Amino acid sequence: MGSGYVYHCPDCGEATYIALGIGSEYTPQKIFYGDDADPPLLKDFLPYQMYCNAARLLQDGGVPDTTHSGSYGQKLYYCPQCRTLKVRFFCTIVKDDQIWTPVYSCELCGRSLVLAPNQENGDDPSRDQMAGADGDVLRIRCTKCGRVYFAPESGCTSKIMWD
């Protein structure tokens, strides 16, 4: 099950929707392998080249980590330079001694995004998740006016559970 959170920019009111987790219809089989009629959904969740790398690893005998509901799905990442939050698909594929996870880059500065802490046991973006590994506060960048704000500054206006 996934959850969504809506925050509004304090300046222009633009809504930012943060969707985390994964719906129950997105089974590991459908995500990582697809079925007779459809290709793997992983193709929709990852940038093309990243998907190609993951698909190659799976075809070569790699195994996705599906040990618990939080081991794959939409997660919070942040840029250590810009201090802004991003939602990206997280998964782990293991083959022999090789462990593969997606590596994303910030669209603003090009730095590698970091998985936000404290997401192991759930997907509710608590205040702890809104802080980077160094404890500094992370922020949301408004896509309309560019204002950068801390989510609790505007308050979560809606919480949505999705499946």
Model-inferred region functions:
Residues C9-C12, C79-C82, C106-C109, C142-C145:
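Short cysteine-rich clusters marking metal-coordination/redox-active sites
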Residues T101-L113:
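Disulfide-bonded cysteine-rich modules in secreted/extracellular proteins
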Residues Y72-D96:
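Short, structured interface segments
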Residues S24-Y26, D65-Q74, V94-T101, N118-R141, ...:
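Short linker/helix segments within small regulatory modules
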Residues Y17, T84-R88, R111-L115, G132, ...:
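Short functional micro-motifs and their immediate structural scaffolds
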Residues G2, A15-Y17, G21, P28-K30:
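Large eukaryotic, non-enzymatic subunits of multiprotein complexes that serve as scaffolds/tethers
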Residues M1-Y7, Y17, D163:
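His-enriched metal-coordination microenvironments in redox/metal-binding proteins
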